């Protein structure tokens, strides 16, 4: 275990990535076994086995004897939630204050999340207005509590002719840099409203039209149903109070 400057014991960067991935998989309702974890991380089964043993020794992970499912201990969940909070706040800082794109910000946040102390993380949180979610709409845990959010349903299930509000981009979608860039460039982000123009199941796509005033209104985007299944929506035009907007003071702080 590594030591942070504020005196808190932290898992190493690699260990934190394992815990974060397990957290994501549990959040998707997937039973986590070593083989699935290796596939998700793109590493060998032997590498995962070695890390699982290490995390078990450090009291962060347990393995069910019969099913071989991997479960985080309370200490493991705490470590994963702390890392995710730092990652999410870093993404807000990088996208809304510094101006990076979603994909670049996600990559940079993986570096920042291991460098921030709790003190600095708390100050960033305050500067950003304590966002309840990451920029992609996934809830940020604080003090062991995760804010209640609507569950929503997959965009791929929406019917032609309906209006939908983007609720969140799942962690699975966040792992695809090209998809993140595509979504950002086309305004498919939490809080934005679209009309489902067409669902072409025979070719596996759906077409959306942005519902907004000004230049952004009427923009059409065609997205694959496989990608749409990784997005969550609310039916109709949802209350915009659900969606965080970074305070102007944060942007002013960046420009001096």
Describe every region a protein language model picked out.
Residues 217-256:
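Glycine- and charge-enriched low-complexity intrinsically disordered segments
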Residues 52-53:
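Short, hydrophobic-biased segments on the C-terminal half of alpha helices
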Residues 1-42:
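Extreme N-terminal segment that seeds HTH/winged-HTH DNA-binding domains in transcriptional regulators
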Residues 56-65:
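A short, conserved structural fragment
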Residues 46, 103:
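Key DNA-contact positions within bacterial/archaeal DNA-binding proteins
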Residues 113-228:
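Mid-protein regulatory/catalytic core that forms ligand/cofactor-binding pockets
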Residues 67-87:
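Basic, amphipathic "hinge/linker" alpha-helix immediately C-terminal to the N-terminal HTH DNA-binding motif
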């Amino acid at each position: 275990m590594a030591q942070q400057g504020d005196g808190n014991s932290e898992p190493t960067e690699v260990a934190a990535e394992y815990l974060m991935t397990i957290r994501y998989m549990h959040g998707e309702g997937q039973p986590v076994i070593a083989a699935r974890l290796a596939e998700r991380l793109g590493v060998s089964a032997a590498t995962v086995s070695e890390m699982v043993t290490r995390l078990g020794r450090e009291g962060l992970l347990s393995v069910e004897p019969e099913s071989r499912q991997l479960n985080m201990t309370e200490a493991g969940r705490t470590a994963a939630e702390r890392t995710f909070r730092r990652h999410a706040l870093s993404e807000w800082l990088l996208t809304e204050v510094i101006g990076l794109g979603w994909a670049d910000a996600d990559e940079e946040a993986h570096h920042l999340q291991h460098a921030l102390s709790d003190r600095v993380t708390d100050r960033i949180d305050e500067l950003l207005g304590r966002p309840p979610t990451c920029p992609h709409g996934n809830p940020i845990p604080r003090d062991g509590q995760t804010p209640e959010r609507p569950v929503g349903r997959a965009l791929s299930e929406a019917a032609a002719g309906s209006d939908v509000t983007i609720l969140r981009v799942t962690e699975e979608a966040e792992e695809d840099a090209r998809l993140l860039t595509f979504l950002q460039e086309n305004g498919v982000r939490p809080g934005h409203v679209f009309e489902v123009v067409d669902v072409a199941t025979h070719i596996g796509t759906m077409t959306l039209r942005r519902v907004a005033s000004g230049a952004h209104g009427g923009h059409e985007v065609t997205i694959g149903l496989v990608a749409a299944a990784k997005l969550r929506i609310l039916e109709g035009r949802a209350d915009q109070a659900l969606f965080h907007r970074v305070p102007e003071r944060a942007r002013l702080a960046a420009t001096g």
